[in-house]
């Protein structure tokens, strides 16, 4: 289940967000039944484009900087969704998590954009 919150300046109509989350769930089955909230917020003072939190009910909150361009937004959301997948699959080591997320974010971003071009 997907929820959105915050001050949306990137993808205000969620024309990329919803298809991207669906596409990622097709790539990683563990995401299919996850409860995820995407919160666009000004992270300018945080020195980060995004970060992911999980609560005691195993519900995920992804904060994403709301001043990214659409390409940065997609790459960042993919990175954070990889962290959701990792948590669901029990991968908890920080370095291992970041290594995987950074190594997969750009290839997955390119695959997502390619899949969008074949639809139109």
Give the location of each predicted region.
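Short histidine/acidic/glycine/proline-rich micro-motifs that form metal-
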Residues: 8-10, 68, 91-92
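Non-transmembrane alpha-helical segments in soluble domains
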Residues: 21-25, 78, 102, 106
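Zn2+-dependent metallopeptidase catalytic core
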Residues: 11-33
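Active-site scaffold of zinc-dependent metalloenzymes
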Residues: 39-71, 84, 88
